[in-house]
A protein has these predicted regions:
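Short terminal or interdomain "cap/linker" segment that borders an active site or interface and mediates
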Residues: 2-18, 114-147, 154-207
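N-terminal leader/assembly segments
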Residues: 1-67, 201, 206-207
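Amphipathic interaction/junction segments at domain boundaries or subunit interfaces
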Residues: 37, 41-145, 166
Length: 207
């Protein structure tokens, strides 16, 4: 893993510029600015991992005050996928996921996440048809954010009735138990308006 953990500009853009466009209140933008993310200025090429975790925590608290921090982080993970598809790199990557399907999408987990940071490593264990364990080396203090990204990516790849459970989270690494129903024949991305329904069709438990 890299000596200094960095999150790249395109990840910040996917969440805060694209995925949450028009949804950030002034109080949230002010708190983000204080934490090191000024959305009124050009984004930096990369941000420290600890700062990234702070940005996500602030957004979760500000946008989803009636929900737990973990539930809000999950929604931010989905927003990351929604926003990523609006970037040039994201459009290319998510189009590929539709072709690959859910299983091969998971096989590319490290490569997919490394498009947005310099530290992700993963190991995938296939337990049965549409049933996997995905270990990730660093998910920070908000593992449900990564779960939301996995959920959104699998949905993009055509999976339905997605279920994600967390196991063995130690503050850094986490194992995600993932299962889904048969992939849909037409695996287009659910639009932003479908986000709530898509979340309800999935499940996550902290064990």
């Amino acid at each position: 893993m890299a000596d200094e953990l960095l999150v790249f500009e395109q990840t910040i853009e996917a969440v805060f510029v694209r995925g949450l466009h028009g949804r950030l209140p002034a109080t949230c933008k002010a708190r983000l600015r204080q934490a090191g993310l000024d959305l009124d200025q050009k984004l930096r090429p990369a941000y420290p991992f600890d700062a990234w975790m702070a940005f996500l925590r602030i957004a979760s608290e500000e946008l989803y005050p009636e929900q737990t921090l973990e539930q809000g982080a999950w929604k931010l993970g989905e927003a990351c996928i929604d926003g990523f598809q609006e970037t040039m790199l994201g459009r290319a990557m998510l189009s590929l996921l539709r072709v690959l399907g859910p299983r091969r999408t998971l096989l590319r987990a490290t490569q997919n996440f490394r498009a947005g940071n310099n530290y992700t490593e993963s190991r995938l264990k296939e337990l049965g048809p549409r049933n996997f364990e995905l270990w990730m080396n660093e998910v920070g203090s908000l593992p449900t954010f990564t779960a939301g990204i996995i959920f959104g990516g699998l949905r993009t790849a055509g999976a339905t009735s997605i279920r994600i459970e967390m196991d063995g989270y130690d503050g850094h690494a986490c194992t995600y138990r993932i299962s889904w129903s048969e992939a849909s024949v037409s695996s287009g991305v659910a639009g932003k308006g479908d986000s709530r329904a898509a979340t309800r069709s999935g499940s996550i438990n902290s064990l």
